[in-house]
Amino acid sequence: MTIILKPGSVPLETLEKIYREGLPVRIDPAFHAGIEKAAARIAEIAAGDAPVYGINTGFGKLASIRIAAGDVATLQRNLILSHCCGVGEPLSENIVRLIMALKLVSLGRGASGVRLEVITLIEAMLEKGVIPMIPEKGSVGASGDLAPLAHMTAAMIGEGEAFYRGERLSGAKALGKAGLKPVVLAAKEGLALINGTQTSTALALAGLFRAHRAVRTALITGALSTDAAMGSDAPFHEEIHQLRGHKGQIDAGRALRTLLEGSAIRRSHLEGDQRVQDPYCIRCQPQVDGACLDILRQAARTLEIEANAVTDNPLVLSDGRAVSGGNFHAEPVAFAADQIALAVCEIGAISQRRIALLVDPSLSFGLPAFLARKPGLNSGLMIAEVTSAALMSENNQMAHPASVDSTPTSANQEDHVSMACHGARRLLQMTANLNAIIGIEALTGALGVELRKPLTTSAELAKVIAALRAKVAALEEDRYMADDLKAAAELVADGTLSGVISAGILPDLET
């Protein structure tokens, strides 16, 4: 299945499909005429006498140097090779595929001036599985993601490296094995390919998709913990949240209320329970997870706009002029990444407190210490809780806003930058930590519910426990725990736990 992209109106759901499923993409042919028109205009400018940045001039601080017409192709090739300065491990294939798809969307709007053959090469590389090797580090998020996108473009011109069928090869060999030929870049094409926010945006989108799946699963594990602790569902009453009015809070409260519906555990303590109120980690779940959901939705709106944006420079305007601007500055992406990081921290923080509550016999309303069936002889989930605390603290340290940092580059020509790329990249590690925390809560919550037998939980939560138990057996006595934690985290990350919940219960991003 090939996804047909309509530049300027590609929805988040399509971008998530590209990220998660690695499907090939193509630009809607209806956009080809506009692409060719802008390319023809760039060719006219290149043949003329007027200096235009990036077409017949140097780059950055060297913009005042005029380039002869005969050197225009060499200029573009030199630009790519000189900007291949990335360091670190290669970005994963699904991230690079998303980067390439976003670049197609940007170029496809017909304001960049690249020829159609550049577009079709990117499409063919995605279809045949030629994935450029892009190092993870080296971008400051303005003037675009220069180094990462230079590595992408290097493979297109037969330089650099690329992966093909799991093998890391030179760019030329990877193209050759796939039956493709490198492109010779014309005027401005190298600049159009490397000048843009596609790397930062792809990383931020990946973080968003992972965080959204995590918060949906955290609502499930939070409901499990509520039932395991014999907590009250009264704080999830719809009118409470309507009186405050925040959409995320309303949606989170409704989800928690529905997930707990029909629980025999809950019915067992409706009368005669001497506790007046539950701790905040139980009672305030709608307020905390709902606020996180709202901030993820705000970031989603920003990133959907950015994914459809034209972010190179100069741009070919509708009147045919090539005008320099600053759309390559990734400040909106940096802000969105910082917002996502804050949400990831808080989802994990309140989840960790519920884990701590369930393993503490002074708080868990009758559950054994550390959920061990024979406390003392067995330590149960004692150190799993410690691990969740370590992961929470690590995420807190990584949440420092990247967007507040800036440093001048390129001889002060590029004197304020966004730091969006590493601000977005850290979300991959943060969401991996979050998945592990929520996975641990799934283990504690499920075991806590099982220890309440013969009382049973709700039908929805019973499905979650069954999905968990298909991969992780209930803890009867101490055993090697690392595999359990890994399996539980994977069930969060791959959507297994959230996938068993009936449609319409868990909240969407709703951009």
Curated annotation (Swiss-Prot):
Keywords: Cytoplasm, Histidine metabolism, Lyase. One of its GO terms (cellular component) is cytoplasm. Pathway: Amino-acid degradation; L-histidine degradation into L-glutamate; N-formimidoyl-L-glutamate from L-histidine: step 1/3. Its main location: cytoplasm. It catalyses: L-histidine = trans-urocanate + NH4(+). The keyword Membrane does not apply. GO terms for biological process: L-histidine catabolic process to glutamate and formamide; L-histidine catabolic process to glutamate and formate. It is found in: Cytoplasm. Contains an active site 4-methylidene-imidazol-5-one (MIO), which is formed autocatalytically by cyclization and dehydration of residues Ala-Ser-Gly. It is an enzyme of class 4 (lyase). There is a cross-link at residues 142-144 (5-imidazolinone (Ala-Gly)). One of its GO terms (molecular function) is histidine ammonia-lyase activity. Pfam families: Lyase_aromatic (PF00221). The modification 2,3-didehydroalanine (Ser) is found at residue 143. Its EC number is 4.3.1.3. HAMAP family: His_ammonia_lyase. Belongs to the PAL/histidase family. This is Histidine ammonia-lyase. It comes from Brucella suis (strain ATCC 23445 / NCTC 10510).
